[in-house]
Amino acid sequence: MKRSDYPSTKVSTSPRRLVAASPQQPVTALPGPDDVLRRTLPNGITVLARENWSAPSVVLEGYLLVGNLDEPEDLTGLASYTANMLSRGTRHRSFAEINEAIESVGASIGFGADRYTTSFSTKSLAEDLDLVLEILADELRAPAFPADHVEKVRGQRMTAIAERANDTRQMAGLALRELMYADHPLGRDLLGTEQSNAAIRRDALVEFYETFYRPQGMVVVVVGAIGAEEAAAKVAGVFGDWAGERPARPALPVVPGLDGVRERRVPMPDKSQADIILGWPAMPRLHPDFEKARLANTVLGVFGMMGRLGASVRERQGMAYYAYSRLAANKQSGLWLASAGVNPANIERAIRAMLEEVERLANERVPADELEDCKRYLTGSLPLQLETNDGVASILADIEWHGLGLDYVQRYCDIINGLTADDVLEVAQKYLAADKYALAVAGPMYGDLQIAL
């Protein structure tokens, strides 16, 4: 499960020696209550473990309840900055020593932060799990925040901010989020600005860590060539004595809706491509409409050549380099987005074509054959996600985060197959209002092209 808009910090190397897998048979059934161990430690850490003996590797994924919702408003980016520093040295190991230890066994450890959580992940051979867990626990429990690395990471973040300012897709995304959320905490920039990153000092990083990094609500998922009970015991061995509670996170205000069309254009005259994003407020992940909207979104901009948007705007009309839609839902709210990258001369035509497809979805029932194709896509893609330990760990972490229940994967196909064309029409009419949406465009505007010509 990816929660970070800022790249995780990872150290890895090429694969090392091959080790024979256990003679036990690989797990082929969908994960569920019968083969996923779930255990809560006395300090509030939840451990989920699933065995898979088809390869000698183990994947670990998890998160802590600290994110950019916990930042001071004037220090946006503090959560991801703190996450970037976790692998930069601890009270027991230097940055170089961590790298050498991890690289010597061909393993990887990564961190990232999003709005709600700070995530971590590891990958290693099963025989090296003890070492990886020891280093992971050291990084999470005893980071040193060495001053020289604080400045090195600051430089990397400043470079990322500069690169983002030169990227039409990212700038359109920033503008869209500002339109949708305004001053709401969910609209905060994960990476932060040049000003906020310049203002973040080492003592702010240390204070943020010491205030919010606590085991309460932490989740650790282990999947691979290790017994479930053994995996849980190993996690308890390195994290079980971690104590303390973080301050309660204040309740978020209600996300404001849209009362009309909001539009923002970000001129980037030196670019050859413009990026368009249309956005509508959507539902939280646990809302009864979510699965209906998932199917509707598959029709609109996922299935085949990116759904109807791709078929119309890209393939049939030839106006876009890409066109697709996405449904993003969190605990409090959601966004329904339609995006396209186009030749700047096609901006207005592409916007009209995208809106036409959205309106068609909200005004006409999806034909039975198209609906069945999209259902088969959704149900057929699930086994592909579960082919790897990474995929299983990601889904289990997502299930735990949203409280979907360990049987969710086993229920999923029935949920999707039970949806109808009326469900798709209903949810499209409810959320994809023709007169209430946000529009963000970044790139050369038509006037820029005229001047250039």
Question: Residue spans of the language-model regions?
Answer:
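Generic structural signal for individual residues within well-ordered alpha-helical segments
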Residues: 99, 130, 151, 198, ...
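Histidine-acidic residue clusters that define the catalytic metal-binding segment
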Residues: 15, 19-39, 178-218, 250-256, ...
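Short, polar/flexible loop-turn hinges at active-site or ligand-entry regions and domain interfaces
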Residues: 88-92, 140-148
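M16 family metallopeptidases and their MPP-like homologs
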Residues: 48-50, 55-84, 93-140, 158, ...
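A short, flexible N-terminal coil/short beta segment enriched in small residues
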Residues: 152-161, 165
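His/Glu-rich zincin catalytic helix
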Residues: 1-101, 121-124, 134-136, 206-312, ...
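Conserved short beta-strand edge segments in small beta-sheet-based binding/regulatory domains
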Residues: 146-152, 248, 364-366
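Short, low-order "capping/linker" segments at domain edges
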Residues: 163-165, 260-271, 380-385
